[in-house]
A protein has these predicted regions:
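Glycine-rich phosphate-binding loop
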Residues: 2, 161-166, 170-188
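Active-site helix-to-loop segments that bind/position phosphate- or nucleotide-bearing substrates
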Residues: 1-4, 8-123, 131, 136, ...
Length: 197
């Protein structure tokens, strides 16, 4: 109940019990909580693992974290930790200082949300995020849905794996639910001259 109040207060969305069936959190037939409710709760068994490496081959650990709890909590903890991993370089020209990060914050946010919302929760493995000095890699279980190609994704074809979860994240204004996330990542990275994410 405390998590429900926190979500309602932070995102201004009503998650009261009379909305559970419509949101896909309870079954209409037996009034039992659904797997989606478990994933969104603090009892969620899935985790997000982030590792920072000293080398290109990602074998020499510099630091690592594993975040559990609800996927909302995992999102918040992961985004905060990734912000620490996102190096900032400052340059001074005359009297003006310019700060530049390795990766746009919005691109990191989109990639993380994509990994959380579209992963296959029938697998028990964790979302894996690998970071080194040259890349930030997001690995989410499940792969592309049958019939979808990477080119479809680049074009903005939207086919959510977890429809009810996508609807909830859309209500929370965390995602657009319109297939724009991947295109936005590519656009943001192209602005800092990363052409093949």
């Amino acid at each position: 109940r405390q998590r429900q109040m926190c979500i309602r207060d932070r995102y201004k969305v009503d998650f009261s019990e009379d909305k559970y069936i419509a949101l896909g959190l309870r079954n209409i037939h037996d009034d039992q909580y659904t797997n989606l409710a478990l994933i969104l709760s603090d009892q969620c068994q899935h985790t997000t693992k982030i590792a920072v490496f000293n080398d290109e081959s990602c074998t020499e650990f510099r630091d690592s974290k594993e975040f559990g709890g609800s996927i909302f909590k995992q999102f918040e903890n992961s985004i905060n930790y990734l912000a620490l991993c996102n190096r900032t370089v400052s340059t001074i020209k005359g009297v003006v200082r310019t700060d530049k990060q390795d990766y746009p914050e919005e691109a990191i946010r989109e990639a993380l949300l994509n990994a959380l919302v579209h992963r296959d929760y029938s697998f028990s493995g964790s979302i894996i995020i690998n970071v080194n000095d040259s890349k930030m890699e997001f690995i989410s279980l499940g792969g592309l849905l049958p019939g979808l190609s990477t080119e479809d994704i680049r074009l903005g074809v939207s086919q959510p794996r977890n429809k009810k979860m996508s609807e909830i994240f859309h209500r929370l204004r965390l995602i657009e639910s319109y297939g724009t996330g991947i295109r936005r990542i590519f656009k943001l990275l192209s602005l800092i001259h990363i052409s093949d994410p």
